[in-house]
Design a protein with these regions (language model features):
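Helix-biased detector of long, well-ordered alpha-helical tracts
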Residues: 1-332
Length: 332
């Protein structure tokens, strides 16, 4: 669904009032957080989607990494997961589902969590993901509502998975470009969480289907600030620039930009390729971390030690202005 449609539906839901519900549905948070005791809070999330790649094992890896990401974005540690499956068993052999589940289990195992069960329904197309429960210490919780003026913004993974997977579905994506995107999408965001901890960060969000620009705007609105992104500083996956020029955009790219129009202003030069990529729907994208400038080097060093070479400072947090988001383009 589009961000606009989801926002409308959630707006009509009843509010829940419980002092132990630390983070709920408000503010477009990445996951829910519930206090079991003063020392132990649980983090809960669920995510699933249709295949983006042909290999069922790799699809399972990507879907699991994407589901686990929300727990990492909150500063948490995944502990248990439940498989969520839609599968056309009257059309495809069960070996396909076995490979999907095997790929998901491999990523869950890498995360140090366990799969405790799941639920499967017959569907007209494949869908797979996880419901994940994690834990977080109160002093390590990160949310999208804690960005502060003066913070710098670090993006931990390059952008462009929407363009790559769209081109791949049409058999128009070079093998090396798809391989680079798969490597990024299957990488667990524990790397970003650990880097955020190294920088004592308290604000983060993961970049997924609504794209960098919308997720940044959501962080700005939740935090009561304005976020400024420098478009020309955005890191891109290998080969994405050519795919943008060839027009392999997702439908979500257009709807993401339409939703953001009233929340943002654009400064600087003419539209650039990187400006469009700011709205590209990501799958298992990186974390956007807001951190004090004095700790930015510690965060980047942690990321690069973990081979997240594309990690970059992409913007900053400003006092609240008329617009939640400012996109700055280089003036030639």
């Amino acid at each position: 669904m589009s961000v606009e449609g989801i926002t409308q539906v959630v707006r009509d839901l009843p509010a829940f009032h419980d002092l132990n519900l630390i983070v709920g549905a408000e503010g477009a948070s990445d996951a829910g957080v519930y206090r079991l005791s003063d020392e132990l809070w649980i983090v809960q999330t669920v995510d699933f989607f249709p295949p983006l790649v042909d290999d069922p094992f790799v699809y399972g890896q990507i879907a699991a990494a994407n589901s686990l990401s929300d727990v990492y974005a909150m500063g948490g540690t995944p502990k248990t997961a439940l498989n969520v499956v839609g599968f056309p068993d009257d059309q495809l052999p069960l070996e396909v589902l076995s490979e999907i589940l095997r790929g998901g289990a491999e990523r869950v195992q890498q995360a140090g969590a366990v799969i405790a069960g799941g639920h499967t329904v017959r569907d007209v197309e494949i869908k797979y993901g996880l419901s994940v429960t994690g834990i977080v210490a109160p002093d390590e919780l990160m949310t999208n509502r804690n960005a502060r003026p003066g913070d710098v913004l670090i993006l931990t993974k390059p952008l462009g998975t929407g363009y790559v997977t769209t081109a791949a579905k049409k058999d128009r994506c070079p093998d090396n470009v798809l391989a680079a995107a798969i490597q990024s999408m299957t990488q667990l965001n524990v790397v970003g969480r650990d880097a955020a901890r190294a920088g004592n960060a308290r604000a983060a969000t993961d970049i997924t289907g609504f794209g960098l620009a919308v997720h940044a705007a959501e962080m700005a609105l939740a935090s009561g600030v304005t976020i400024q992104l420098h478009v020309d500083h955005l890191p891109l996956l290998t080969g994405v620039e050519a795919l943008v020029e060839q027009g392999f955009r997702t439908r979500a790219t257009k709807s993401n930009r339409q939703f953001a129009e009233s929340l943002m202003k654009i400064e600087g030069g003419p539209d650039t390729m990187r400006l469009e990529v700011a709205f590209d729907a990501q799958t298992s994208g990186g974390l956007l971390i807001a951190v004090d400038p004095s700790m930015a080097d510690a965060v980047l060093q942690s990321l690069r030690t973990a081979e997240a070479a594309a990690a970059s400072i992409v913007g900053s947090v400003l006092p609240k202005q008329e617009h939640a988001l400012i996109l700055v383009r280089h003036v030639v």
